[in-house]
Amino acid sequence: MEKQIHGGNIYDKEVSLDFSVNINPLGMPDGVQDAILNNMSGYETYPDIRYTALREAVAGKERVQAERILCGNGASELIMAVVRAVRPYKCAVAAPSFSGYERAVSAYGAETEYYKLDEKNGFGYADACSQLKDMDIQMCFICNPNNPTGNLIPEDILVNILDICRDRNIVVVADECFLRFNPQYEIISCKRFLDDYDNLVIINAFTKFY
């Protein structure tokens, strides 16, 4: 079996609809196309290295401070950037979950340790906390909702994971790339924990929802 690390490779295949990366099958929104065409006169200049206008726009949409926003070329680049910045020697990753976490960890010479989701309970996170308590790690990835199972992490378990990691100086990387599809996004996003947990990093993506 061929190992799949990321979808979207349609160029050597005949593909009508690509569901491998869960992007919008309707194509680029008209507003995005208009913005590109209407700003072509500035393409010869370097962009603002601090992405000031973009960060302020994202901050307004997400209702967080602009200084907390870091923009990148997709979630995978940001996952790599977090690992590069923290330089952990061991990271916890759920199994099963998105393979990009392990790829980023190994790219910087760190080790991946898996906390296993309960298959008998629909791959829930019920046992995650007890497993994390016994791990010697510097970073923990959580995916909410999890990819590929689609499960949301229950509120009590999510807070428990954040508490465990804060008490042990473990950076929590919360991948919320698919969370906006939930109508309760603003209520259940980890954004509400940013003031209480300075070890929390949230990853989000433009392509999935827009």
Positions of PLM-derived features:
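N-terminal "arm"/small-domain region of PLP-dependent enzymes with the aminotransferase-like
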Residues: 1-45, 170
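PLP-dependent aminotransferase class I/II
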Residues: 27-32, 100, 199-210
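Phosphate-binding glycine-rich loop
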Residues: 51-91
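Short, structured coil segments at secondary-structure junctions
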Residues: 65, 108-109, 196-197
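Active-site pre-lysine segment of PLP-dependent enzymes
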Residues: 123-136, 148-168, 172, 176-209
